[in-house]
């Protein structure tokens, strides 16, 4: 770096001399031309200037060289200090490694000593195990000789004994847990159903197979009969309803098992009596008019039912079929009102369980829709209802609810189960349905006779209006297990042989009494 600086300085001097010479020459030439200055003066002046430049450059080079020298010395001192520090750190690491090496050597010695001791102990343990195994084998042979059983046979016998004991304990535990679970489920179900039923207050009107038309006077009976009975025959032929004209004052009785035809006949007869003109031609007109009026009533009844339940987007033809249930009864219970009640109950139950309330109401409303035309189409009302629901593109959940509410198929959703429960609630509620007294008495007698036909039954009592049969059994003949079997057998026979609305509870009572007399 110093040599390069010197070269640069010399080069600068040379360039300066050359430049000075050129400048001097030019000046000299100019002075010669302008002022006539001599060449010696110009050369002397150029030499002086060159000498000054040379001195300045030499001075600058010396100063720069001194600065470079001082910086080099400083860097050298710093590097020497860094090397000394690194050397000290290396010495410290070396000392640490030596100490760690000493510690590892000591640990190796300790581990070798421990391994030696462990080997000695292992040898002692092996010797003891061998001795113990010998004693065990000796004792096993002695036990096998005394008991006459091999080790495997003895183990199997012990396992069988333990299994028998555990099986009994498990059976008791399972029975107890089943009882607790049933009690909990029954309690929750009863609370849910009780809450739901209390929220619904439905009105029911008992229906019959006859209708009565009041007349303004008894002379009207003759006009209804007509000459040679042609008027009454025409009316009966057109409506399919029997007209009973007897000694009942100012009244005509219409008898028929089709409520819609009976309503058409009643409406036509009321209109004929009001009009006063009664002859075959007029009867035909009035019957046609009555049919239209009843159709309107049916349609209005269906629309009113869907409006009350808040069910929308139902096919108009299905709404009309639903309205026909207004004139359909089951055990004296109006089926349309029953369907509305089931819809309300289904919606309430669905709300309690977090299910779709609207869908539950729709399924409840349509569950008995097949009864509207079951006297016109072959098949049970369930099968007819399923076909109607499919025909009018109802939801699969609704179809399954219709199909499963009497147990014909398995329910595939919670809503189907809720509809079946709501149907049973509506039908079994006291006062919802009625039977004739004769059928009622006959059914109760048959229920008691069936229960008393089993061996060990002392007496059977039909209670709760025939919704429960209480069977008293002999404790000497029937034990606890047989009591459960007897209840199931009676239940199965009732289901196979008897027809009844709702459910019948079978209760078997087994009572043991210990009696002693103090003398």
Curated annotation (Swiss-Prot):
The protein's role, per its UniProt record: Endoribonuclease that initiates mRNA decay.
Source taxon at top rank: Bacteria
Name by which UniProt lists this protein: Ribonuclease Y
Organism: Staphylococcus saprophyticus subsp. saprophyticus (strain ATCC 15305 / DSM 20229 / NCIMB 8711 / NCTC 7292 / S-41)
Domain named HD: residues: 335-428
Keyword flag Hydrolase: yes
InterPro entries per record: HD/PDEase_dom, HD_domain, HDIG_dom, KH_dom, KH_dom_type_1, KH_dom_type_1_sf, Ribonuclease_Y, RNase_Y_N
Domain KH: 209-269
